[in-house]
Swiss-Prot record:
Compartment(s): Cytoplasm; Endosome membrane; Nucleus, Nucleoplasm
Gene: VPS25
Tissues and organs where the protein is expressed, per its UniProt entry: Expressed at the mRNA level in kidney, liver, pancreas, and placenta. Lower levels of expression are found in heart, skeletal muscle, brain and lung.
Role summary: Component of the ESCRT-II complex (endosomal sorting complex required for transport II), which is required for multivesicular body (MVB) formation and sorting of endosomal cargo proteins into MVBs. The MVB pathway mediates delivery of transmembrane proteins into the lumen of the lysosome for degradation. The ESCRT-II complex is probably involved in the recruitment of the ESCRT-III complex. The ESCRT-II complex may also play a role in transcription regulation, possibly via its interaction with ELL. The ESCRT-II complex may be involved in facilitating the budding of certain RNA viruses.
Protein name: Vacuolar protein-sorting-associated protein 25
Gene source species: Homo sapiens (Human)
Family recorded in the similarity comment: Belongs to the VPS25 family.
Amino acid sequence: MAMSFEWPWQYRFPPFFTLQPNVDTRQKQLAAWCSLVLSFCRLHKQSSMTVMEAQESPLFNNVKLQRKLPVESIQIVLEELRKKGNLEWLDKSKSSFLIMWRRPEEWGKLIYQWVSRSGQNNSVFTLYELTNGEDTEDEEFHGLDEATLLRALQALQQEHKAEIITVSDGRGVKFF
């Protein structure tokens, strides 16, 4: 079932595509952009992108209004998301990024809640089983990309709730 995305009112407002000079207005505008990016990526389960892809995406390019957020402004929005812990640059040139509509700690908490709820403590899973197995089909983390999953499991490992291990066909995790 494909869900349609409901664009916020600002997306239909041409000045939204120009970062405003007034500090207070700009902060509100950046907060709106951050919220939009996270909602859009969450709905589309999009976890990584390049800045060039972002610039051409409907996210930053409103074809109906014929308005596009300039690449310099996109970089500012992305940097704001990084400061909040929702984005990680994948290269030094800052041309590609991992977008996390939930921070790794939040994903870890969701995964661990499922483990506890389903009585899976002291069990070992492959990464594939966790995100693509039948047992997790109804969970929000089902289909989660491996990069984000690993960050979530690393957060759980720091809390001594899990250990990332090597299994015969790749990586796995043991929950405590």
